[in-house]
A protein has these predicted regions:
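Conserved coil-to-alpha-helix start sites within the AMP-binding
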Residues: 84-89
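A short hydrophobic/small-residue beta-strand
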Residues: 78-79, 92, 99, 159, ...
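N-terminal "arm"/small-domain region of PLP-dependent enzymes with the aminotransferase-like
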Residues: 1-30, 352
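Active-site phosphate-binding strand-loop segment of PLP-dependent enzymes
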Residues: 107-195, 200-202, 207
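Short, conserved catalytic or interaction motifs in soluble domains
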Residues: 58, 104, 189, 217, ...
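Phosphate-binding glycine-rich loop
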Residues: 32-77, 91-94, 101, 125, ...
Length: 374
């Protein structure tokens, strides 16, 4: 059988080993050191909005710290986009808080501003005002930033911007990862750049970054001995892994262009085909890195048939994220919406999108698509 075509596999740029070797040569193996500092500066320079970045062990850790920094505690309610990966919602439970899930809108597949406001009004009247909003740029597609911000500001609720999938995307020329009161990034192995495993917290002030780093290094107080006046976490990024990130940052823009080219391959392929929709930017204000290219088919049955046809040729594809309000672990929590995310999940499929896919890989994908849609 031919080699596997992955949905989104790591793509090294060439200089990752140089930074890793420097870490070994200088014995900076711990979760601190020149690569960590350099990686944070590289991201800050790239985002270019006067932000401060704390490199962490995962995007999940970054969301957890964001909730702590915003004062989320037991029994607080936190609004969360339902159509996302579970890592967006799990940290709410870590804090013994209560998630309130909100549906997507049909253009970007991200949080619906109308459903968001409905949720805020309902919870404020029946319980208490939610303490934070976690909103996601799904598959690299920016959410409706202005509309979501308008609702959040109207009710004075801070936004945690989950930009785990959207490094390299932008809205009205501003980089994703800079729109939240606190924002997060992910560098998991399947992301547009990787540190093997890793993430980052992005803030607007140096003081908040320093607080995040303090919490991420077991909240050790300034003392000659180990002194702790609050609970901390082991969430800092390894200097070795940060070296991978420094090499990856050098090729980020190239990776974005390659993924956008792969997305255009699918747009062109399906452009004259009825019943198949490719996720695309709704206007020139939106610029997606197209981390994953996703389509919506006519039915669940057709979606599954295509997935299995690709699988039979050793080509990975994957259904869209199953909404959190449909997950067994979250079914007891409130949901506000009209079924958009459920419909997308039932009919949607992510197709191979990696920046390292070859012409031969594209041809193999095309052959399967041709046979399926003939």
């Amino acid at each position: 059988m031919s080699n596997k075509i992955w949905l989104s596999s790591p793509h090294m740029g060439g200089n990752e080993q140089k930074y890793i070797q420097e870490a070994f040569a200088e014995n900076w193996i711990a979760p601190l050191g020149p690569n960590v500092n350099g990686f944070e500066k590289d991201i800050e320079h790239y985002l270019n909005e006067g932000v401060f970045v704390a490199a962490l062990s995962s995007g999940t850790a970054a969301i957890h710290l964001a909730l702590i920094l915003l004062g989320i505690e037991k029994d607080d309610e936190v609004i969360c986009q339902s159509m996302t990966f579970s890592a967006s919602a799990n940290p709410i439970i870590y804090q013994n808080a209560t998630p309130v899930f909100v549906d997507s809108e049909k253009e970007t597949w991200n949080m619906c501003p109308k459903a968001l406001e409905e949720a805020i009004i309902d919870r404020t009247v029946k319980s208490k005002k939610p303490k934070a909003i976690i909103v996601v740029h799904l598959y690299g597609m920016p959410y409706k930033v202005d509309a979501i911000r308008a609702v959040a500001d109207k009710y004075n609720i801070p936004i945690i911007e989950d930009s785990a999938e959207a490094l390299g995307s932008s809205y009205k020329g501003q980089k994703c990862g800079t729109f939240g009161d606190v924002s997060i990034l992910s560098f998991n192995g399947n992301k547009i750049i990787t540190t093997s495993g890793g993430g980052a917290l992005v803030t607007k002030t140096k003081a908040i970054k320093e607080k995040a780093v303090f919490l991420a290094t077991q909240a050790r107080d300034a003392a000659p001995h180990y002194e702790h006046s609050q609970i901390g976490y082991n969430y800092r990024l390894s200097n070795v892994c940060a070296g991978i990130g420094r090499g990856q940052m050098e090729v980020l823009d190239e990776h974005v262009q390659l993924r956008r080219t792969m997305n255009q391959f699918y747009v062109n392929y399906f452009s004259k085909m009825d019943g198949v929709t490719v996720l695309q930017e709704p206007s020139v204000d939106f610029y997606s890195n197209h981390w994953l290219s996703a389509i919506v088919l006519q039915s669940y049955e057709q979606r599954e048939a295509l997935r299995l046809a690709l699988e039979s040729e050793n080509i990975e594809s994957r259904p869209l994220w199953k909404p959190m309000h449909l997950q067994p672990v979250f079914t007891k929590y409130l949901f506000f919406g009209n079924g958009t995310s459920e419909d997308l999940f039932n009919r949607g499929l992510c197709l191979p999108s990696g920046s390292n896919l070859s012409v031969a890989d594209k041809n193999r994908i095309r052959v399967v698509l041709d046979a399926f849609f003939k």
